[in-house]
Amino acid sequence: MSTSDQKRETIMKRSLLVLAMGVALSCTACAGGSDTDKVNGSISVSAGQPATDVSTVNGGVRIADNAQVKSANTVNGGITLGDGAQAAELDTVNGSITLGAKAAVSGTVETVNGGIRLANGADIKGKLSNVNGDINLDSAHIGGGIETTAADITINGSSKVEGGIHVQKPSGMNFGGSNKVPKIVIGPGATVTGALDFEREVELHVSDRATIGSVRGATVQKFSGDTP
């Protein structure tokens, strides 16, 4: 099965999961569900609360500075992990994901339609992935690589991405922005280990002070200074 087919299958499964979550969470709500398990409405987690799974269907998730959760999931809404906060995984369908300074995720970070931003010192042990939406790293770390279809990617400061970068070709499904040529910028001082693998046309700009692995499917455009 091709990577594009796998992505289609993943999103089909995700759509079914949305329906299942709606039914299950509706039943929970009828029974007086907790503030960390909703159908409609945003969720906020304060520091000092016991770490638990948090999920909603229609609403954002805000995890305060230095707070802890297990997984944080929503369907229609963004997720914010505050400065120094910790989570096992972050997952949304339609919404952005933001990690504050020194925030840490021990697993994966994934959105379908939404940007992802990592502040100084943020750390993701697993993979970071999306389909659409800009990906921005500012002196952050990713242990499991970056995967996208149509995102512009900017890797700045002392950021280190282990596991490479994989840009998939668009599938037959029409995701907004999939016809736009993604722009990949690896700035001065940044490091990407592993392969940079591009299945579609991209603009690949790499600082003469950056370190990268092997490149397949794109031509490196070197630049000096802070930006291309």
Where are the predicted features?
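Intrinsically disordered, low-complexity terminal regions
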Residues: 1-228
